[in-house]
């Protein structure tokens, strides 16, 4: 199957914004932590988003993920404390694409040959959010695991989309909890 140049350009134009909006995640952990003994959790104060509805969505998504991983909520005597931190940052998004040289075909006279290239550049202001989730050993009072997720925020999203975005972000961040410890 051969892609024609206009179709290839259209495909690239469609994919670039999708790749730019992808969430980046990472995690780190204390290799001495005994994750298999962590059975219960309680939330501690972190750095909330400052928007109660967003904070409620984050807590609900974390509760769902922790429950799926076998942890139960225990506010009086938890094995770990879970904290989350939210940061927002305005950034510039600069993207460009070039059409590349165009071939005009064969022929005599002034009509044939290669054409000029054009490059389009787009600069826009974006809001990037970072969500950090800390799992702190309640007895040692030390961070056992930290997950981070960074993504462009869609400020025009409807509530249902925000629910989905936050739940998806938390799921992706918590994917590597507990970490697979190599012996």
Predicted features and spans:
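Surface-exposed short loop/turn segments
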Residues: 69, 80, 84-142
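Second-shell loop/turn segments in exported
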Residues: 44-53, 70-71, 119-121, 153-160
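A structural "domain/chain start" motif
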Residues: 18-69, 75-93, 180-183
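Short, low-complexity, polar/charged sequence segments that are solvent-exposed and flexible
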Residues: 60-64, 100-105, 152-154, 164-168
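"Short basic amphipathic alpha-helical interaction patches in structured regions
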Residues: 58, 96-100, 148
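Bacterial N-terminal signal peptides that target proteins for export
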Residues: 1-13
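C-terminal/domain-edge helix-coil "capping" segments
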Residues: 4, 22-33, 123-130, 137-183
């Amino acid at each position: 199957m051969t892609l024609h140049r206009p179709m290839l350009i259209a495909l690239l134009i469609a994919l670039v914004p999708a790749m730019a909006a992808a969430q980046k995640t990472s995690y780190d952990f204390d290799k001495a932590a005994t994750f298999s003994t962590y059975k219960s959790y309680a939330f501690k104060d972190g750095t909330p988003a400052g928007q109660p509805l967003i904070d409620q969505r984050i807590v609900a998504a974390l509760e769902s993920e922790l429950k799926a991983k076998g942890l139960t909520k225990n506010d009086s005597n938890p094995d770990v404390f879970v904290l989350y931190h939210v940061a927002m940052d305005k950034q510039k998004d600069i993207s460009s694409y070039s059409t590349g040289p165009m071939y005009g075909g064969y022929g005599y006279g002034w009509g044939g040959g290669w054409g000029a290239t054009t490059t389009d550049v787009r600069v826009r202001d974006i809001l990037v959010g970072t969500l950090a989730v800390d799992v702190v050993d309640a007895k040692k009072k030390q961070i056992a695991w930290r997950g981070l997720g960074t993504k462009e925020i869609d400020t025009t999203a409807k509530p249902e989309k925000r629910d989905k975005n936050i739940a998806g972000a938390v799921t992706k961040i918590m994917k590597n909890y507990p970490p697979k410890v190599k012996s």
